[in-house]
């Protein structure tokens, strides 16, 4: 959605619309989402449905098992305040190619950014 929200607000918006924040069960879905996010939808990142349930243990908000990941090098990490507990997909390329669309980063859940909801069939 083009609306910018914290991860928690995005979660609530998706639930209110009978959906979930998008989960990524495999590379095929990750590639689809990477291609789906059009220029202008997101600034640098876009919320997905992953969150750090316990330190070092990631889960999907829809309850599906965590079977796939596509972390950027050095991620997930933690900041001094230990608030990087939510998953975002990178939507831009850095000049040095250290960041590229489709890679994942753990981000402070309070930051506001675009997000993707999904609905079960």
For each feature predicted by the language model, list its residue ranges:
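Extracellular, disulfide-bonded carbohydrate-recognition/adhesion ectodomains
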Residues: 1-121
